[in-house]
Amino acid sequence: MDFISIQQLVSGERVEGKVLGFGHGVPDPGAWPSDWRRGPQEAVAREKLKLEEEKKKKLERFNSTRFNLDNLADLENLVQRRKKRLRHRVPPRKPEPLVKPQSQAQVEPVGLEMFLKAAAENQEYLIDKYLTDGGDPNAHDKLHRTALHWACLKGHSQLVNKLLVAGATVDARDLLDRTPVFWACRGGHLVILKQLLNQGARVNARDKIGSTPLHVAVRTRHPDCLEHLIECGAHLNAQDKEGDTALHEAVRHGSYKAMKLLLLYGAELGVRNAASVTPVQLARDWQRGIREALQAHVAHPRTRC
C-alpha cells in the first residue's frame, strides 16, 4: 500500500499509478486545484491587501474632512467646528447654588450671653454685630469670664486678634484672678499665647492660689507653652500658696518632658514647699508610695500567683 508523501503534496509533483488498497483510485496531486496548494500564502496576502485598503479608506476620509487654512475665515470655521464638537462631548456644568452667609440672617441685637457663646464657638459674625452695635468687648459673666478668655481657651486666634483690636483688656481677670494667658496655657494654644505676650500680657501673673502660667502649663502637660513662657522670662522657681514650684508640679504629675525642660533651663532642686519637701524628696516619696502599693498588692493572699 503506497501513500503520498508530504514533499509530493507541497511540491505538486505528479504521481502515477498510486492506488489505495481498497480499490479507490487516488487522483494525481499535480491535477489538484492550485488554491489548495497555495492556501496559507494566499490567505496572508489577502489579509495584507485588506489592511492596505482600510488604511487607504481612512486616509481618504481624513483628507476629505481636512480644512485648508488658506485665510482667516477658514480658521474661524475650524474653531467653531471644534467648539461645536466639544459642546456635544462635554455637558455644560451646572452652576453651584449660592449659599447666603449666616451673618445676613442675624438682624436682631446680640446680647451678652450670645456674645460670650459666640466667642467660645468662633462665630465671628455675631461678634462683629455685637461690636458694631457698640457692645463692650470687656463685658463678662458672673464669673468675670470675658470673650477673650473663651477665645483663648478654645484656640480661636483670629477672634483673639479681633477682640484685642476692639479694645479687649489683655490682662482681664476672671473670678479666680486668671488672665487670658492662663486660659491659653490651659488649652495648650501656643499661637495665642504668643499673641497675648506680644501685646504686653504679664508672663508672671498670679491667680488666687498663687499659681503662675508656668504652673498651669505643667499641670495641663503642654511643654511647648512651658518652654515659650520660660523663654519670655517666666520665673522658674516661683512658688504658689502651697510653696510648690513648677518642678514640684512636674514631679507630682509625672511629666517627664516638663521636668527635663525645667532642669535644662536651671530650675532649682532644693526649693522646699510648705510641707518642707523638695522636688527630689517628692519624687522619692512618690516612688516609695508606688513600691509600697505594689508590695501590698503582691502580699495579699488573693493576688498571689
UniProtKB/Swiss-Prot annotation:
Tissue localization of expression: Mainly expressed in heart, skeletal muscle and brown adipose tissues.
Organism of derivation: Homo sapiens
Name the record gives this protein: Ankyrin repeat domain-containing protein 23
Keywords per UniProt: ANK repeat, Coiled coil, Nucleus, Repeat
Complexes and interactors: Interacts with titin/TTN and MYPN.
Keyword Nucleus attached: yes
Region (Interaction with TTN): 178-195
Placement of ANK repeats on the sequence: 143-172, 176-205, 209-238, 242-271
Any single GO CC term annotated in Swiss-Prot or TrEMBL for this entry: I band
UniProt-annotated stretches for the region Disordered: 83-104
Biased composition (Basic residues): 83-92
